[in-house]
Amino acid sequence: MAPGDKKQIIFVITTIGRPSSTVVPFKNLEVSEWSYKKGIKNGYDDYRDPPSPKPLPKSKQEPNADDKVGDIEYDEMVSVRDGYYSDVCRLTCTEDTKIFIADHISLWRYIMDNAEKLPNYVVIMEDDNTITGEGFITNLDNITKVLNDNNVDILQLVTHTKLLKDRNSQHLMLLPDLEAFKGSFDVSLSAYIIRQEAVRKLYSYFTNNKPSFDISLEILRIENTLGITRYVVDNDRYVYHDYKLANEFMKNKKNRLSIKSRIDGWIMDNWPSFYHRMYYPLFSVFGKYDITMMFLIAIVIIIGLAIFDINNKLLWLLSGVFLAYSM
């Protein structure tokens, strides 16, 4: 099959459980759902070790601390997933970050294994995004041609901030109403188009240097070294990241009925992007306690009160309430 004859495909990574038909509501091309668990079932992982001999049964055998990750049973899925990131990440990354790393790296492996069947540029989206304009689908070949002609390796379809684009660089007109700027610090793998050559570079790097943090941050550090050119679209006219969907999923996982959860719900409904930034776990302590931006702000306030020797009891009370609320 000639390269030009390869049909476009969109990979939808399962993060919150939305049907792929709602992520891509148009039937113009093939959509394939993905998660690292699917990769394990299909054998697309490098981390499956030969089964070790089972020990002889012992009476009153003490539980092994290595058999658990936090409160999660250390089963085969978790064992294989742990192979995608470093031991540091295993202790400090949140559960969402670990799944995120495994989902993307396992999909990159699948793309490499099926390179001959797939187009040069592949679309990858997490399922808290929605393609809102059919023009993106019908013009996908034209968009990838612009990317190829300008030697762009990654096109971010979503950015969480519009202030960090390098607007002094050459901008690309992808469509009459959609342009892209060279990416700066706004790295996001929520939705992106990636060239197969970039997939190979990233996969090779992360298998030899297992990530200790969110791979979005790792890419920011290594993209120039790997020679990867990344651009970011300047609007959400065609691909929309819905913070409310991600926030609702995060809220349902907590499943708490309290005044705090009602306040959280009100903030989530009125300022979804603010809620996502403040409440989304940044890292974890020993894989058990998630640390958010809200918690860090509360700690900084308390440290500031202590450093400047503030004796106002009301301020200390309010900062204590804020700290308790952030936990």
Swiss-Prot record:
Q: Which UniProt keywords apply?
A: Host-virus interaction, Late protein, Membrane, Transmembrane, Transmembrane helix, Viral attachment to host cell, Viral envelope protein, Virion, Virus entry into host cell
Name the GO cellular-component terms: membrane; viral envelope; virion membrane
The transmembrane residues are 291-311
Q: Name one Pfam family in it.
A: Pox_P35
Gene Ontology terms: biological process: symbiont entry into host cell; virion attachment to host cell
Quick one: where's region Disordered? 41-69
Biased amino acid composition, Basic and acidic residues: 59-69
Q: Could you name the domain of life of the organism this protein comes from?
A: Viruses
Concerning InterPro entries, the annotation shows: Poxvirus_P35
Keyword Lipoprotein found = no
Biological role stated in the UniProt entry: Envelope protein that binds to the cell surface to provide virion attachment to target cell.
Q: What is this protein's record name?
A: Immunodominant envelope protein p35
| Organism for this UniProt entry | Fowlpox virus (strain NVSL) (FPV)
